[in-house]
Amino acid sequence: MKKQLDQLTAYTPGLSPESLKKQYGIRGELHKLASNENVYGPSPKVKTAIQSHLDELYYYPESGSPKLREAISQQLNVDASRILFGAGLDEVILMISRAVLSPGDKIITSESTFGQYYHNAIVESADVIQVPLKDGGFDLDGMLQQIDNKTSLIWLCNPNNPTGTYFSHDELFNFLKRVPSDIPVLIDEAYVEFVTADDFPDTLKLQEDFDNAFLLRTFSKAYGLAGLRVGYVIASEDAIEKWNIIRPPFNVTRISEYAAIAALEDQEYLKEVTQKNSFERDKFYQIPQSQHFLPSQANFVFVKTSRSQALYDALLNVGCITRLFPNGVRITIGLPEQNNKMIEVLKHFEY
């Protein structure tokens, strides 16, 4: 058994509404707003696509999701040979880490970011440098200072989970200019569809100038397919060819591929979802207490407080399950009535 596994624990999902009702003695409905899921669900066209292909369940999937790869290739205008799929971005991160890292290698990322970068590096006996956040966001200059000849991967999350903060196109461009070209920079844009900032990076454009800039995206968030597990990376052909050796043969299911294609085709529905999210997100920042909130470009708001357990409990008492952190609470933006209840709590909470 790998000794480094003793440094880790298995991922612990939030408690279910039923478990929380029992633990806290709550009656009435509880709304799960802890995992940044799209509360509006997927496009109706996804449900139609799933139903129309149920008779194919006894077939193995087509390895590599060729139909979905071609659909993304056409929509984003990238060569299909540069796209690799995983069962969610969790598996993509695992495959990249397994393919790239050897014992003693080093990854650089941030504190208070998505935990799978750290987790998979430790599994591969790599060292992890976590640079503290600066004003709630990635300290890109601080990360540059940590690069040395042991650095094998750099992980960025934009917008960052759990803070919702982002760095701009110019900031990313200047960062990439200073990173040695042989070090892959993985840019996780799981929440990109929710972004409204005009200066958010055009990472696909930056890839034209930086061969080591690799982009990760998912169907779990804005497209509402978290339960079907479809994520992907757009990288150089050489990198994809190597990483594909690690990919399990049938990792993305047949139904998941059909569902993702249907979701991708319904851009009008995606636009409706992201506009609703933007409107509801803005409501949180219209109250004076928003001085305690980190600015978000995602479908969640991070509330800073030294009394995070008390805030979590207060939100739970109005029927909303959120995500507890030592220095705050992350609130997934819900339906209007759910958000209104949470905003009332936030207005009267003592931070």
UniProtKB/Swiss-Prot annotation:
Domain of life assignment: Bacteria
Modified residues (N6-(pyridoxal phosphate)lysine): K221
Pathway listed: Amino-acid biosynthesis; L-histidine biosynthesis; L-histidine from 5-phospho-alpha-D-ribose 1-diphosphate: step 7/9
Keyword annotations of the record: Amino-acid biosynthesis, Aminotransferase, Histidine biosynthesis, Pyridoxal phosphate, Transferase
UniProt cross-references to InterPro entries, sorted A to Z: Aminotrans_II_pyridoxalP_BS, Aminotransferase_I/II_large, HisP_aminotrans, HistidinolP_aminotransfase, PyrdxlP-dep_Trfase, PyrdxlP-dep_Trfase_major, PyrdxlP-dep_Trfase_small
The protein's Enzyme Commission number: 2.6.1.9
An MF annotation (GO) of this entry: histidinol-phosphate transaminase activity
One Gene Ontology biological process: L-histidine biosynthetic process
Transferase is among the record's keywords: yes
Cofactor(s) required, per the database record: pyridoxal 5'-phosphate
Catalytic activity as recorded in UniProt: L-histidinol phosphate + 2-oxoglutarate = 3-(imidazol-4-yl)-2-oxopropyl phosphate + L-glutamate
Subunit structure: Homodimer.
Similarity field: Belongs to the class-II pyridoxal-phosphate-dependent aminotransferase family. Histidinol-phosphate aminotransferase subfamily.
Protein name: Histidinol-phosphate aminotransferase
Gene: hisC
